[in-house]
Swiss-Prot record:
Statement: the UniProt record of this protein carries the keyword Hydrolase: yes
Region (Small ATPAse domain (RuvB-S)): 204-274
EC code(s) of this entry: 3.6.4.-
Catalysis: reaction(s): ATP + H2O = ADP + phosphate + H(+)
Cellular localization per UniProt: Cytoplasm
Region annotated Head domain (RuvB-H), chain positions: 277-362
Cysteine pairs bridged by disulfides in the record: none
Species for this entry: Bifidobacterium adolescentis (strain ATCC 15703 / DSM 20083 / NCTC 11814 / E194a)
Start and end residues of each stretch annotated as Large ATPase domain (RuvB-L): 15-203
EC class (word): hydrolase
GO annotation, cellular component aspect: cytoplasm; Holliday junction resolvase complex
Protein name from the UniProt record: Holliday junction branch migration complex subunit RuvB
Gene: ruvB
The UniProt record lists the keyword Nucleotide-binding: yes
CDD domains for this protein: AAA
């Protein structure tokens, strides 16, 4: 059966926190500008074609094979992990593997419990309901979903005022696939309804190289040896960023009439966008330089740091710092932000004797 995707136009609304700056960054894991989250030309349609996450793939394959042999819809699935790692793609793959339709919506798109009730009551037997950003569902919608996921029914209110009554509406068996970047924000009762929970991790360079090589073949880009590696190094362990950078390199190749892309072409193309070998962009470098040159390596408070780089404190904290901390360029301490030795070395600056020694931190 050919799968059907019904997408609400508001499905992929992004959180407001730091959204303006994040939406302009080439190395953002969230969609940039009008870039679609759903990219059919690059998205694999079967689990075997999904690159990376080998343990998760093995678990999910077993889970789906068992459901097919039992000839029943599988348990509800929760996909958790940072943005851009393939949660939406996996949801589409599950529906395709099961040969059932998929309905797509998101937490922000569901404003009232009635919105969700309308979707649930229209589901067919075996259909998949994919809810992106499920942690952002309104409380009333969450409570409605508890019952629907466990008992496969919704309670419909008939009438108004004191005479109103609740009539249970039985639903066919279906599968909810929830995606979240903040699993901790999900209420325990909702988490408990998911029979299968998968956590997606950032990709190592080797797996990103394979993904880039696959995407380049789909896009018709000839990459020479080492070019995929240069792209992978700058992609922050995130497939969405890797595919975005690959497209910008394709633009470079087209404009310069290149038949194939060399590693040096990747370096030149992405240097134009101020993306360096570690995947750091203009804002990342500005933050590190401010700490190192203006505050001698730190510690420095968040507000002072934000003022130095001309950004809102919230933007620096939520958009820039997570990657710098994850990659060991920055440390958050009770006294403030501190640049690590790796940051000094990356900037090509030798710390003087009065620089804050992060090795002495307790």
């Amino acid at each position: 059966m050919k799968r059907t995707i019904m997408t609400n136009t508001d499905t992929f609304e992004q959180p407001n926190t730091g959204a303006n700056e994040e939406s302009l960054r080439m190395v953002s894991a969230a969609p940039v500008g009008n870039e679609p989250v759903s990219d059919e030309e690059l998205r694999p349609h079967i689990l075997e074609g999904f690159i990376g996450q080998p343990r998760l793939k093995a678990q999910l394959q077993l889970f789906l094979d068992a459901a097919r042999k039992r000839d029943v819809p599988p348990d509800h699935i929760l996909l958790a992990g940072p943005p851009g790692l393939g949660k939406t793609t996996l949801a589409m793959i599950v529906a395709n593997e099961l040969e059932v339709p998929i309905r797509v919506t998101s937490g922000p798109a569901i404003q009232h419990a009635g919105d969700l009730a309308s979707i649930l009551s229209s589901l067919d037997a075996g259909e998949v309901l994919f809810i992106d950003e499920i942690h952002r569902l309104p409380r009333a919608a969450e409570e409605l979903l508890y019952i629907a996921m466990e008992d496969f029914r919704v309670d419909v209110m008939v009438g108004k005022g004191p005479g109103a009554s609740s009539i249970p509406l039985t639903l066919p068996r279906f599968t909810v696939i929830g995606a979240t970047t903040r699993e901790g924000m999900l209420p325990s009762p909702l988490r408990a309804r998911f029979g299968f929970t998968a956590h997606l991790d950032f990709y190592p360079h080797e797996e990103l190289e394979k993904l880039i090589e696959r995407s380049s073949a789909v896009l018709g880009i000839q990459l020479e040896d080492g070019a995929a590696r240069q792209l992978a190094m700058r992609s922050r362990g995130t497939p969405r960023i890797a595919n975005r950078l690959l497209r910008r390199v394709r633009d470079w190749a087209i404009v310069h009439d290149l038949e194939s892309v060399r590693p040096d072409d990747v370096k030149e193309a992405l240097a134009l966008y101020q993306i360096d070998t570690e995947g750091l962009d203009r804002l990342d470098i500005a933050v590190l330089k401010a700490i190192v040159t203006n505050f001698n390596g730190g510690p420095v408070g968040l507000n002072n740091l934000a003022a130095m780089v001309g950004e809102e404190s919230e933007t620096v904290e939520t958009v820039c710092e997570p990657y710098l901390v994850r990659e060991g360029f920055l440390i958050r301490t009770p006294k403030g932000r501190v640049a690590t030795r790796k940051a000094w070395e990356h900037l090509g600056i030798t710390p003087d004797e009065s620089a804050y020694d992060v090795n002495e931190m307790s």
